[in-house]
Amino acid sequence: ITPCALPRTLFVLICPPSDKVMKFWNQPTPEEWTQNVIKELKNYTDRPVEIRLKPKRNERIADGNIIHALQNDVHCVVTYNSIAATEALLNGKPAIALGPNAATVLCNTSLSQVENPTTFDKLTMEAYAAHLTYCQFTKQEMQDGTAWRILNESS
C-alpha cells in the first residue's frame, strides 16, 4: 500500500468500462461514456487526460497492467465500476467511481471533485484491503453457511 501524494502536474487517467458492463448497467457505449466524461471533466479541470482501455486478459499480467500505469504521473483515476478504482486506491492514487463497485465506499463519485479528490492514509487503506480480503469466500464457505455467518457477525 502506497501513501498518497499529489503533485500538480499530473494527468487524469480514464479507465473506461467494457461494453458488457455498460450493457448490463443500461449505460451508453464505452466510447460514448468516455467522451461524456472528457466533456464534463473540462468543466472542472484543465489537466491533461489519458485513456487506458482494459487490456486483454493475457496482457494484464505483463508490464501494461494498471499498476504500471499508476506509476506514471496520475492525479486520479476515473472509471465507471472497474477494479482499476480499487487498484488506484491501494497504490496511493485517488479514484472517482461513477458506478457501483467495491471501491465506491472510498471513491469520490462526482467528476466535480477531480481537483480535490479524497485521499487516505496508510491505516485506512490497510483496513480497506483487509475488508476486501475478508469478504472473499470459497464455494464451500458459501455452501456451508460460513460466509453468511461472517457477514452477519460484521454487520
Predicted features, each with a name:
Residues 37-40, 102-105, 120-122:
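Glycine-rich loops and low-complexity Gly/Arg-rich segments
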